[in-house]
UniProtKB/Swiss-Prot annotation:
Record PTM: Phosphorylated. Phosphorylation upon DNA damage induces relocalization to the nuclear plasma.
Lineage: Eukaryota, Metazoa, Ecdysozoa, Arthropoda, Hexapoda
Pfam families: XPG_I (PF00867), XPG_N (PF00752)
Name of the protein described by the UniProt record: Flap endonuclease 1
Residues the entry annotates as binding DNA: 47, 70, 158, 231, 233
InterPro entries: 5-3_exonuclease_C_sf, Flap_endonuc, HhH2, PIN-like_dom_sf, XPG-I_dom, XPG/Rad2, XPG_CS, XPG_DNA_repair_N
Residues covered by region (Disordered): 346-385
Main EC class the enzyme belongs to: hydrolase
Cofactor: Mg(2+)
Length: 385
């Protein structure tokens, strides 16, 4: 779920915290990517296109196709991805998971009704709602990444929290996910739409943590309380308090405790046994692996291993897989060259520098012409002795 309404709130009140760029803008950057979010995107994208990629046994392979080609695209653009996989969800998330299970049951019933009615649009809609990333999907994705020479991290708990820890430790530049709670976990940079398909033509949207705090006129603790008021995965929110009212309350009272002391109980009902304090602690001190002990290495791909893994039962085209492996190798060599070139930087030619050089050349030419004219003119004007 992430944080309800946070993206729009930032766009409205702290637009300076958002920048849209092309993927190539992040050339040379290391980025921690929410793997489960990616796999989900790949699974629903194929369903929406009406295709069903599968093995000879009927097992889906769209997540592998998406991971393979999307990762190659990132590397082609000079981005070094590290994928972070979810671990066990925190106990406080059980309520949200229960709601998702209920929604899944409702979607199954709606899908059956749509199928019986021959409603193609309804079938597609509810099919998408039933998509979920399984442990088997994650296991296969990890095996694929290993063969591609791309690192991954198993988070002990939430992937977004682990991504944020890698960013804060300086291991990577940003977190790439569609869930805004990466900011709540303290990721200084958040990239949305980075792993979207090229066909969607969506610019990458970069959120700056420091600039959003400045724009909203709050500190990091107050930002966490704001996110809890907006609605997060770990506890209920106060009904009737939307984004605008939430930021007004935080700006006025600075924390949830003081807000509760001053809240009009006739207008707003606080959830019974509201676990906002535990939710706050989960954002402040999430369960993550020590980022400093994580060694991220991008190595050469195993071409034959990729062919064996993706072709055969999974029915990938061998020629395309080998071409993909060659692109992986080429991108690694290019990144190595970039590191070498960084030791011998050439100053770019700027308009001012170019104009100055032109003026200097013109002045030198004019001076030479004047000198020549003076010399030749003097010769003609002198009388012979």
């Amino acid at each position: 779920m992430g944080i309800l309404g946070l993206s729009k709130l930032i766009a409205d009140l702290a637009p300076q915290a958002i920048r849209e760029s092309e993927m190539k803008h992040f050339f040379g950057r290391k980025v921690a990517i929410d793997a489960s979010m990616c796999l989900y995107q790949f699974l629903i994208a194929v369903r929406s296109e009406g295709a069903q990629l599968a093995t000879v046994n009927g097992d889906p392979t769209s997540h592998l196709m998406g991971m393979f080609y999307r990762t190659i695209r990132l590397l082609d653009n000079g981005i070094k991805p590290v994928y972070v996989f979810d671990g066990k969800p925190p106990d406080l998330k059980s309520g949200e998971l229960a709601k998702r299970a209920e929604r899944r049951e409702e979607a199954e019933k709606a899908l059956k009704a749509a199928t019986d009615a021959g409603d193609d649009a309804g079938i597609e809609k509810f099919n998408r709602r039933l998509v979920r990333v399984t442990k088997e999907h994650a296991k296969e994705a990890k095996e694929l990444l290993t063969l591609m020479g791309v690192p991954y991290v198993d988070a002990p708990c939430e992937a977004e929290a682990q991504c944020a820890a890698l960013v804060k430790a300086g291991k990577v530049y940003a977190t790439a996910t569609e869930d805004m709670d990466a900011l709540t976990f303290g990721s200084t940079k958040l990239l949305r739409y980075l792993t979207y398909s090229e066909a969607r033509k969506m610019p990458v949207k970069e959120f700056s943590y420091d600039k959003l705090l400045e724009g909203l006129a709050i500190n990091n603790r107050e930002f966490i309380d704001l996110c809890i008021l907006l609605g997060c995965d770990y506890c209920e929110s106060i009904k009737g308090i939307g984004p605008k009212r939430a930021i007004e309350l935080i700006n006025t009272y600075r924390d949830i405790e003081t807000i509760l002391d001053n809240l009009d109980s006739s207008k707003y009902t606080v959830p019974e046994n509201w676990n906002y304090k535990v939710a706050r602690e989960l954002f402040i001190e999430p369960e993550v692996a020590d980022a400093d002990s994580i060694d991220l290495k991008w190595v050469e791909p195993d071409e034959e291993g990729l062919v064996k893994f993706l072709c055969g039962d999974r029915q990938f085209n061998e020629e395309r897989v080998r071409n993909g492996a060659k692109k992986l190798m080429k991108s690694k060599q290019a990144q190595t060259q970039v590191r070498l070139d960084s030791f011998f930087k050439t100053l770019p030619s700027t308009p001012n520098a170019t104009n100055a050089a032109k003026r200097k050349a013109e002045e030198a030419k004019k001076s030479a012409n004047n000198k020549k004219a003076k010399t030749s003119g003097g010769g003609r004007g002198r009388r012979p002795k």
